[in-house]
Amino acid sequence: MRIVFAGTPEFAVSSLRAAARHHEVVAVYTQPDRPAGRGRGLAPSPVKLEAVARGIPVYQPESLKDAAAQQQLRDLQPDLMVVVAYGLILPKAVLAIPTHGCWNVHASLLPRWRGAAPIQRAIQAGDAKTGVCLMQMEAGLDTGPVLLHQELPIASTDTGGQLHDKLAELGAQVLSDGLGLLRAGIKPIARPQPEQGVTYAHKLDKAEARLDWAQDADALARTVRAFNPWPIAEATLAGERVRIHGAVALEADHGQAPGTVLAAGRDGIDIACGQGALRLRVLQREGGKAITAADYLNARRDLRVGA
């Protein structure tokens, strides 16, 4: 079976490996090299690096909307196109090129969290579980029928990065299962998504990372987890702007104004919130690296309870 794989970030690498394990991946599509790092030199995507290491031809069109790019894909004579976090829109004409259409690995239990940031939004919302769907693509945004799915519980300590890694591996497994069925001559049953329960996982914005102490501590703790490793939550702590890499919510009937330091010790720095308190455990000062609350307190001798 001739497979064309389309993906860009690290999340897609596990799925590329799964596709290449027992099938012929005739080409990989990924986004063009982008400026990265302090030197802002052009850097290849993680998927491109994996494809090059495997000797798979790589294509990097700016768009798949023009006729030349579509003909290039058509010339590959794909039986199936697998799309995982590619980042480019696939027009209807592209969806119709492969014999079996285009499959997408999506990191949520559709129709919940359609869109760009399903992993982080699931944590932010306090969802007890998430998962991966293998979807038959159509023109709408993540609206296609689901071929296979697998659930995954969200641990109370999961960060966005940790859940990302779990779902990347789960996505590869679900894709492998689907490809195995197709190779055996069994096309998975396409089940339309329910009309109820649709939510959208909008792209992360750095402005969202700014914590408001007037909010509920549980919600703030979830944001800290969801936004680690990017964009990392930030807040003002006793007059200083800090980034918060790790925090937990506490039940506290404090009666203090939001943002007040309630306690400070080796276990963390407790901050009054609109409801409850947030214990800051890992922080980062501007220009510095992430450090424990104990090390932060050693550096900020001026920090006082009640500030």
UniProtKB/Swiss-Prot annotation:
InterPro entries according to UniProt: Fmt (IPR005794), Formyl_trans_C (IPR005793), Formyl_trans_C_sf (IPR037022), Formyl_transf_N (IPR002376), Formyl_transf_N_sf (IPR036477), Formyl_transferase-like_C_sf (IPR011034), GART_AS (IPR001555), Met-tRNA-FMT_C (IPR044135)
The enzyme's E.C. designation: 2.1.2.9
Keywords from the named record: Protein biosynthesis, Transferase
Binding site for (6S)-5,6,7,8-tetrahydrofolate: 108-111
Family: Belongs to the Fmt family.
HAMAP family (UniProt xref): Formyl_trans
Protein name: Methionyl-tRNA formyltransferase
Organism: Stenotrophomonas maltophilia (strain K279a)
